[in-house]
């Protein structure tokens, strides 16, 4: 297992940066509108646990898959960001269920290995346009909730996006202590 996780964390990282559409800043908060192409993703759902615990569990499942826990025993390397679909509660926390997603590396998009863990699904996802804001550090639930509120305030009432969920994104392996990149994404309504 360590070998699988080591490969997924220390192998090459394929970054999915998206295409910048526009940038803005309001009240000291920078935000961007970006477009991301569709493709194949792996996903897993974890429920009944606090956000931080559920996120870690889901991420570990996906790391095992890209590290070789699949029908081809293929160590695929890592992609970023890790995306966590989160569902806000009325009390400024996140519900105890998450969906963790990771884009399958480009060389495996046409024929991805089948997961050996039946809690992992392969999904075809459509292209999306989204609004994002970035922050550093080791992100926890409170950080994502705070930055989601800031992004919501920046966008105001006239910009339309999905409000029933948002995406919490991390770009860095856990052993990177400085210069960490985290983002909150709101998916634009078409």
UniProtKB/Swiss-Prot annotation:
GO terms for molecular function: heme binding. It is found in: Cytoplasm. Signal peptide: none annotated. The keyword Ligase does not apply. It comes from the Eukaryota. Pfam families: SOUL (PF04832). The keyword Cytoplasm applies. One of its GO terms (cellular component) is cytoplasm. Keywords: Cytoplasm. Belongs to the HEBP family. May bind free porphyrinogens that may be present in the cell and thus facilitate removal of these potentially toxic compound. Binds with a high affinity to one molecule of heme or porphyrins. It binds metalloporphyrins, free porphyrins and N-methylprotoporphyrin with similar affinities. Forms a distorted beta-barrel structure, with two helices that are packed against the outer surface of the barrel. Porphyrins are expected to bind to a hydrophobic patch on the outer surface of the beta-barrel structure. Monomer. This is Heme-binding protein 1. It comes from Xenopus laevis. The lineage of its organism: Eukaryota, Metazoa, Chordata, Craniata, Vertebrata.
């Amino acid at each position: 297992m360590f070998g699988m996780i080591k490969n997924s964390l220390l192998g090459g990282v394929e970054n999915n940066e998206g295409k910048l559409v526009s940038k803005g800043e309001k009240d000291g908060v920078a935000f961007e509108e970006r477009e991301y192409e569709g493709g194949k993703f792996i996903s897993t759902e974890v429920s009944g646990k606090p956000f931080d615990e559920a996120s870690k569990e889901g991420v570990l499942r996906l790391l095992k898959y890209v590290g070789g826990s699949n029908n081809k025993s293929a160590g695929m390397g890592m992609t970023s960001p890790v995306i966590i679909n989160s569902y806000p509660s009325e009390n400024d926390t996140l519900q105890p269920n998450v969906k963790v997603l990771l884009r399958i590396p480009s060389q495996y998009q046409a024929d991805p290995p089948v997961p050996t863990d039946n809690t992992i699904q392969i999904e075809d996802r459509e292209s999306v346009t989204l609004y994002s804001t970035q922050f550093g550090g080791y992100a926890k639930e409170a950080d994502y909730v705070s930055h989601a509120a800031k992004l919501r305030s920046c966008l105001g009432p006239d910009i339309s996006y999905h409000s029933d969920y948002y995406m919490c994104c991390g770009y860095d392996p856990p052993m990177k202590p400085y210069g960490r990149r985290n983002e909150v994404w709101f998916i634009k309504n078409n």
